Amino acid sequence: MSKPISQIEPLPHIAATKPYVPGGKLHGAKGAVAMLASNENPFGPSPKAVEAAKAAAANVHVYPDPDYGPLRAAIAAAKGIADASRVVTSAGSDEIIHLLTQCYAGPGDEVLFTEHAFSMYRVSAGAHGATSVTVPETDMTAGVNAILGAVSPRTKILFLANPNNPTGTMLSVDELKALQDALPPHVLFVVDGAYSEYLGPDYEAQLRDLVDRRDNTVMMRTFSKIYGLAAMRLGWAYMPAGIAAIYQRIRGPFNVSSIAAAAGIACVGDEAFLKMSRDHNTHWRAIMTDALNAMGLPTPPSHANFIVTEFGSDERAAAANQHLKDNDILVRAIGGYGLPTKLRISVGSADDNQRFLDALKAFTASR
């Protein structure tokens, strides 16, 4: 007997939502793979985080603290935040994107983001029935006026990654303030600071202070990048008290594992580890940018832990990507972000960075 056709259908806006496409894997590698596709910290996590996670593993039979008070207090202390109750935690910053969208946007509403923005903004908007509106970019950056010109009475959320992924571009703090001041009060302004630690403590403090200027602004952060806890799935945000209260209503009661919370507490204030990671990134990002430009591959300045380089055509970018794979080097093709002639390359270890440069030099010499 044939199996009956299922009559269970997803909601139309769910069926229409295109899923997030992560960085690829390298199958059939001949040796050690240079992982330069996902913007991970080449040093791994802070040793303090590793030790804390090991200790916490002995108690995984006990539910986590549902309030995450120690984690929120540690984040607030490390980031100069006076009121830890305005810090919220999450299973990666993706969860913050989803929960804020669930709280503030739905069918008939618009969620605004820039043309080459992190694709989870679009996924979350679609998952909650909202309409995605993209702001065109010039030289991989959307200016304040362009963003404001896309705002409508239906706009409920503006997501702005600063620095942006995958382009590495950013608006200045003065531009962020101008944008914040000009936004209508009904628009939630979410600044995604996933890569802000790479700009240093002064910029982090400026983002924090941006939240305190208006009651419609949220700063979102992650432990996946400079802190090296990508597999832990740990994020946080700083927001006005009223928005935090709404967020906490629908956050899962145990959304962060006790192991992730312990690791976060241990590493969020590890300034020596952060400085080492930031200095390494700044040093090698400059070397890689200069080397690629010298090869005739236009590579603009980046403010994150990756660079984006131009190959002139879709075909040449694909050929370069395949050449790197053939040499056990994994980078990120970003055609899905509307940038098919470019590749995004994470700043990795010194050895992996040099392997990448040597392989690409061989490619450009032959093509």
Curated annotation (Swiss-Prot):
HAMAP family (UniProt xref): HisC_aminotrans_2
The keyword Transferase is annotated on this UniProt entry: yes
Keywords, ordered alphabetically: Amino-acid biosynthesis, Aminotransferase, Histidine biosynthesis, Pyridoxal phosphate, Transferase
Encoding gene (name): hisC
Keyword Transferase: yes
Modified residues (N6-(pyridoxal phosphate)lysine): K225
E.C. number: 2.6.1.9
Family: Belongs to the class-II pyridoxal-phosphate-dependent aminotransferase family. Histidinol-phosphate aminotransferase subfamily.
GO MF term list: histidinol-phosphate transaminase activity; pyridoxal phosphate binding
Record-linked Pfam families: Aminotran_1_2
Binding partners and assembly: Homodimer.
CC cofactor: pyridoxal 5'-phosphate
Parts forming coiled coils: none
An individual GO BP term: L-histidine biosynthetic process
Protein name as annotated: Histidinol-phosphate aminotransferase
Catalysed reaction, written as an equation: L-histidinol phosphate + 2-oxoglutarate = 3-(imidazol-4-yl)-2-oxopropyl phosphate + L-glutamate
Protein's pathway: Amino-acid biosynthesis; L-histidine biosynthesis; L-histidine from 5-phospho-alpha-D-ribose 1-diphosphate: step 7/9
PANTHER family: HISTIDINOL-PHOSPHATE AMINOTRANSFERASE, HISTIDINOL-PHOSPHATE AMINOTRANSFERASE 2
Leading EC class: transferase
